[in-house]
Structures are given as C-alpha cells and as structure tokens.
Amino acid sequence: NSSSAATSGNSSSAATSGNSSSAATSGNSSSAATSGDYSTATATGGDCSAQVEGKNSLAIANGAHSKARGVLGCYLVLTEYTDGGKLLCAKIAKVDGTAIKENVWYTLKNGEFEEA
C-alpha cells in the first residue's frame, strides 16, 4: 500500500497516496504532498512547500522561504536561509493543535515557527 514519486525542476510537484508513501521534489517553487499514514513529503529549493495529510507523517521543506503543513500528530521540518544562501537553522515541530496548528502553513523566521 505504499507509493513513491520524485520530480525535479523549477515549479515541479509530486503527490502520493497510500500508507508509508513518499513524495520528493527539488527545484525552486516545488511542492510535495502525501496523503497516507506514516508518509513523508520532502521538497527542496527556494519557495518550496511540503504537506502531509496522514497520521504520523513527516513534511520536510528545505530552502529559502520554504513552508510546510500537516495534520495533528505529524511533524514539520523547516530550514531558514540568509538572502545569500547561507543556512541559518533547521527545526522540527510536532503539529499539536495548539503551538503548531493543524493544516496551517508554517515557515521559519528568526529561528522560530511562524504562520506563513
């Protein structure tokens, strides 16, 4: 019941469904999305986005001005870069419904999760 998809190139997208599925993209403005439990969505590149809709899943967005979102119980991994492309920090947070809300886009700003 698992599936995988991978794409590269600016404005690329990958989407999968099924438990333990994975979607990966690279390129500016790329997006990755999964809708199965225990799944992973990974996007890299400036202005990229990752979203997960299954329980116990992981959304990883690595790039300047990247964003991620997920449902309750999922984890979001985000990075923050300088305008010159230097990595400032990487952080992970659990979507708990309070500090990190369900189905809300987040980005890192000054090292903290902030609604995008």
Q: Each PLM stretch: what is its role?
A:
Residues 1-116:
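Periodic small-residue-enriched repeat registers in elongated scaffold domains
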